[in-house]
Each structure stands twice: as structure tokens, then as C-alpha cells.
């Protein structure tokens, strides 16, 4: 099962129905993506919750003003089709208004961080 797609879909659906929290399976990848979303100001908080032997991440969503459009997440690299980019050709989402989350050899980071460190990687998703 694609945990990244599950995370993105859960957040997207929660925004559609105006839910305040989202619960997803705790994986290191989901935690790192959540950390980036928190750092960039797309979500309010993250916490870990244990239910028996299972661990979950609880994302508290951040809502903007009513008239503004909510955040959009789009999965780019999929299990059946991986999309890679080197740092000079790293895509800019909406001309720099959004972010691309990239999995590199040095961990999961934003496209800006990858360009700054001059490393490429797999483009996981776009957020704007």
C-alpha cells in the first residue's frame, strides 16, 4: 500500500469536509512529510498516538481565511512510475509559491533545500 498517497488523500479529503484533525499510520516517511508541512506552515501541529500496538500520527489542520483556497496536494512519483530530478532541473511549483517534497539521499526535504544543497532526488508530491 502506498502510504504517501494515503497521507495526501487523507489530508485532501479532510480539507474538503472541514475536519480539524487527520489520523494516518505512523511511518518515518509520513512523519518527515508532516514535519515539512508543519515547517512550511501548511498544518498546525503533529503528534503521535498509540492505540494498542499500532502507532498513528495525528495532524491538526490549519485553515486559512474562508475566501482563500485551501492547500492542494498532488502526488507526483508513484510506485509504478518514479519521477526523479537533478538539482538544476528541480521543478518550481507555481513559480515558487508552492513546494515540492523531494526524497533525497540525505532525507526528505523541500525543493528549495535540495537546490541549496545541490542534490537531486525523487519528487514525492507538490503542495500549494
From Swiss-Prot:
Ribonucleoprotein listed as a keyword: yes
Cellular location(s): Plastid, Chloroplast
GO biological process entries: translation
Keywords linked to the UniProt accession: Chloroplast, Plastid, Ribonucleoprotein, Ribosomal protein, RNA-binding, rRNA-binding
Bridged cysteine pairs (disulfide): none
One function term, GO molecular function aspect: rRNA binding
Superkingdom of origin: Eukaryota
GO CC, alphabetical: chloroplast; ribonucleoprotein complex; ribosome
Keyword hit for Acetylation: no
InterPro entries, sorted: Ribosomal_uS8, Ribosomal_uS8_CS, Ribosomal_uS8_sf
Pfam families, per the entry: Ribosomal_S8
PROSITE patterns associated with the record: RIBOSOMAL_S8
Record-stated family: Belongs to the universal ribosomal protein uS8 family.
Assembly and interaction partners: Part of the 30S ribosomal subunit.
Purpose: One of the primary rRNA binding proteins, it binds directly to 16S rRNA central domain where it helps coordinate assembly of the platform of the 30S subunit.
Protein name: Small ribosomal subunit protein uS8c
Amino acid at each position: 500500500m502506498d502510504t504517501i498517497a494515503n497521507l495526501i488523500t487523507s489530508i485532501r479529503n479532510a480539507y474538503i469536509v472541514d475536519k480539524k484533525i487527520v489520523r494516518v499510520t505512523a511511518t518515518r516517511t509520513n512523519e518527515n512529510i508532516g514535519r515539512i508541512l508543519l515547517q512550511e506552515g501548511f498544518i498546525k501541529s503533529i503528534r503521535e498516538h498509540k492505540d494498542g500496538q499500532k502507532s498513528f500520527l495525528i495532524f491538526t489542520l490549519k485553515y486559512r481565511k474562508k475566501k482563500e483556497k485551501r492547500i492542494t496536494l498532488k502526488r507526483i512519483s508513484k510506485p509504478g512510475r518514479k519521477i526523479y530530478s537533478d538539482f538544476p532541473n528541480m521543478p518550481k511549483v507555481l513559480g515558487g509559491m508552492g513546494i515540492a517534497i523531494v526524497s533525497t539521499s540525505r532525507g526528505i526535504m523541500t525543493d528549495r533545500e535540495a537546490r541549496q544543497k545541490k542534490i537531486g532526488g525523487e519528487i514525492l508530491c507538490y503542495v500549494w
